[in-house]
Amino acid sequence: MSPGADVRSIDGLREWIAAAQVFGHDAGEALGGTQMEIRRAFDWIAEQGHLWERAGRVGEQEVAQAKAELAARRFPNFDGKMPDTTVQERNLRRAEDRLEHAREQVLKCRSWAGRLPKIVEESFTGRGRRLQNFLEGELPRTLGQLARRVEALERYAD
C-alpha cells in the first residue's frame, strides 16, 4: 500500500489551487497576446511590402521625370553653349537611389513574408498549441480533481 499524501494544511492546498488558476488565466492571456502579436507582424510585413511597392512606382515616375529634365538640358542654348546639367544629373542619381532602395525593401519584405511562417512554426506553433491544450484541458481537469480531493479531506477532517 502506498504511503498517504501527508497533507498538513488544507488551506495551503486551496491557496495552491487558486494560484494555479491564476497561472492558467495569466498564461492563457499571454498566449493570446503572443498570437495577436504574431498576426500583427504578418500584417505589418504585408503592409510594408505594399508601401514599398507604391514607393517603387513613385520612384519609377521620379526617375522618368529626372531623365526627361536631363534630356531637355542637353540641347545647346541660343548662344550655342551646352547648359550645365549637374543639378539634373544629381537629381537623377538621387531618384535612381530612392528607386533602388524601394526595390530592395520590397525584396526584403517578400523574403520575410516567406520566412516568418517557418520561424513561427518552428519556435511557437507547436509549443503554443501544447500549452493551450494544457491550459484548456489538463489544468482544469487536474484542478477539479484536486478540488474534489480537498473537499473529501475537509469532510474527513470534520
Predicted regions and their residues:
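Long, hydrophobic, amphipathic alpha-helical segments used as structural scaffolds
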Residues: 31, 35, 42, 103-113, ...
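Long amphipathic alpha-helices with heptad-repeat character
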Residues: 17-20, 24-31, 52, 56-63, ...
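A short, terminal or domain-edge coil/loop segment
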Residues: 33-40, 89-100, 126-139
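A composition-biased, non-transmembrane "mature-region" signal
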Residues: 2-5, 14, 46, 50, ...
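Conserved NTP-handling cores and scaffolds of large molecular machines
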Residues: 24, 31, 106, 127, ...
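Short, charge-rich amphipathic alpha-helices with coiled-coil/heptad character
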Residues: 1-48
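Extended, helix-rich structural scaffolds rather than catalytic motifs
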Residues: 129, 133-158
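Extended, amphipathic alpha-helical coiled-coil scaffold segments used for oligomerization/tethering
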Residues: 46-125
